[in-house]
A protein has these predicted regions:
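N-terminal entrance/gating region of PLP-dependent enzymes' catalytic architecture
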Residues: 37-124, 130
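Charged, compositionally biased N-terminal leader segments and the immediate start
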Residues: 1-16, 23
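Alpha-helix N-cap recognition
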Residues: 31, 57, 144-145
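Gly-rich Lys/Arg/Thr-decorated short loops/hinges at beta-loop-alpha junctions or inter-strand turns
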Residues: 2, 100-113, 128-135, 160-161, ...
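TRNA-binding/sensing appendages of the translation machinery
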Residues: 29-43, 266-271
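PLP-dependent enzyme catalytic core of the Aspartate aminotransferase-like
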Residues: 22-25, 127
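Short loop-beta-helix segment that forms the pyridoxal 5′-phosphate
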Residues: 112-114, 131-151
């Protein structure tokens, strides 16, 4: 079998046969077969691959890919109400403009001597989030809401010096899986029943499961079903009476209308930053926050 080079390929550098031969000569070889001679013969493909003819230009390739993409139903043309951690909110143009600024967007990890732009941006973000949440301390963003909730729960358990955690039985199963991954085996996660009529946490079941081993009571406003825990203060009081920390997950957009978690007794607040100007991106590109006093 002869391994052939390309006459000229727009996407593969050094693909011209003359350049290929020059490179082989430099390392003392005559052909690509010699370069691959240590690969076992039985796993080498010897027949021609059934590939379509290559596109001759970037323009042709782009038109082909765009034609394929048009078969999809896009959220640019349709509204999406799936939710569950990835929400279709309008993102003002100023968000993309600021996010793309060179002093903020960089491929470099960043050090204290050259990353002042990012530090300034994060300081302003933390200050505004603290004002929105009415809390004193806000962290730099986490990877997503699930990580923020998991870390907040572990924070609360360390403060309470207990290993038991109560979470709502109605919460997102994927988020619960992440919480269990972060917290076990150090912490024990137990679910509180959901009131089937209201979609909220069952207070009787919550109080029955509170004991001196419970360090954290976690709930969300709004919860997975979109319902608000109208008994939020009673939940927080029950947690505190049992010596536990109250951790609340929130949608920050809702805080323009509803009371902040601190007002009904939350010790730690966490939530999702994706609604605040982050585009949907195949379920990725998420971000979360944590705040405390």
């Amino acid at each position: 079998m002869s391994v052939k080079g390309f006459k000229s390929h727009p996407y593969i550098p050094n693909s011209v046969p003359e350049v290929e031969q020059e490179m082989l000569h430099e390392i003392g070889l005559n052909s690509l077969e010699e370069l691959h001679e240590e690969v076992p013969d039985e796993i080498i493909l010897k027949n021609e691959m059934n590939l379509p003819e290559a596109f001759g230009s970037e323009y042709e390739l782009r038109r082909h890919v765009e034609k394929l993409l048009k078969k999809n139903s896009s959220c640019d043309d349709n509204l999406n109400f799936l939710g569950a951690g990835c929400y279709q909110h309008y993102v003002p143009a100023i968000c993309d403009e600021i996010n793309g600024k060179g002093e903020f967007l960089t491929a470099y990890g960043g050090e204290s001597y050259n990353d002042f732009g990012r530090f300034q941006s994060l300081f302003e973000y933390e200050s505004l989030m603290a004002e929105l949440l009415d809390m004193e301390v806000v962290n730099v963003p986490t990877m997503d809401y699930s990580q923020a909730a998991s870390t907040a729960i572990r924070m609360g358990s360390r403060v309470a010096k207990r290993t038991g955690v109560l979470v709502p039985g109605s919460m997102d199963r994927e988020k619960l899986a992440v919480i269990k991954n972060y917290c076990t085996p150090d912490l024990t996660i137990e679910e509180v029943k959901c009131d089937e009529k209201t979609g909220c946490m069952d207070l009787a079941d919550l109080k029955a499961k509170l004991n001196d081993s419970i360090g954290v009571v976690y709930f969300e406003n709004p919860n997975y079903f979109g319902a608000f825990e109208v008994n939020s203060r009673e939940i927080a009081n029950a947690a505190h009476d049992a010596g536990a920390q109250c951790v609340v997950g929130v949608d920050p957009i809702s805080l323009g209308v509803v009371a902040v978690p601190r007002s009904y007794g939350a010790d730690i607040v966490c939530g999702d930053l994706q609604p605040l100007g982050i585009h949907m991106n195949y379920g990725g590109g998420q971000s979360g926050f944590m705040a405390t006093m």
